[in-house]
Amino acid sequence: MKKQYILLCGATVALLMAACQGEKTAAADADAGDTLEMKYAKLLTIVKHGDGEETSDVAEGIDYQYAEALVANPWKAGTMLHRYILIPKGEEGDKTVAMLARRRSTGARCTTDTVRTPVERSAVFIAPHCQLMYELGCPQVIRGVCDLDYINIPDVKKRAALSGNTSAQNPIVNCGSSMAPDIERIIALNPEAILLSPFENSGGYGKLDKLHIPIIEAADYMESSPLGRAEWMKFYGMLFGNEEGKSNGISGSCEPKADSLFAKIEKEYLSLKAQAAGYRKGLSILTERKTGNVWYVPGGQSTIGILLKDANARYIFEDDQHSGSLAMSPEQILAKGKQVDVWAFKYFGGAPLSQAQLLQEYDGYKALAAFNRGNIYQVDTSTVPYFELTSFHPELLLREFIILAHGERFGKLRFYKK
């Protein structure tokens, strides 16, 4: 079985490399490298090159070590979104950069960036990734953020308030909206990388592309497996540095912390899933509410759809095969979900919505059994760090859904309130 897995990984890497031949900094003919095992992430492949004498290049006089991170395009099967060459800082890393440059080829089919690691200054456009960096022990790397009003991390707010104070330690600059970031502020930050969310048919990043700063396209949110998204922290751990292992002025890697954190999350998630499977099928759960004329609900193979399945809850679209959201009409939802036991949704800002307010929004809500029984659960994402915590901690959201489906034998709800 293990041999089959290795062969499969090798074939996958070969296909990814073939789809990205002719890149700006080719790892190409150096060595095949060792592919890291990714149990759940389908969009990320990491290949490590170099580990002592076996990979020393006698002709080049280099004992090289570097890694490749290959990000598959979530919106176009069989193609690459981005390729990253992670090369350690320091003298040996400088030699590796020069070696790869001499092997450079042309006619790139996908974007490739060389990133010197560990990254010690970064603009981070995504709140969950800011939270993750705190957990990995590298919050000082965050030097700029976007959409500050939507970030529920007290220390980020505190450090952002110190922006402009020349005596402040590790202040954070508000770079404006992630859809139209303040380029001048980003230039002033002098970041070593920019971390952002890619979107389908975005057409690139405009002026950001012209800064010649590596753009880390965090496509983790497109993973359908809850643990698949969390597993991306292994990549981010390789990218960023912490103060603990600092040597010769260069930060230590967050990679060991990321690996151990993911192992802990995986163990807890699988334990909860196994416990939930031991109970009878739980209550039926409907998520979200109407937006305009559309009611968006998770597809059966989406992250939330899989979480509901792993919670052993009933879900009206559990047989659906889509991995993204389903855009349904309110009439379609009511026709299929009138008898749902629990209605759980998110909102932003203000007091929890009363039943009267919900009916003002849409009178059809009164047709839901969960509405009439008062089984309405809400989470205010303006005050509760829901996205910040659950994006890379699916075990927290799994526990939440288990409680909603099976009662409080697993404890009290952390995010949703009745």
Predicted regions, residues:
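Bacterial Sec-dependent N-terminal signal peptides
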Residues: 1-29
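N-terminal ligand-binding lobe of clamshell/alpha-beta domains
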Residues: 20-418
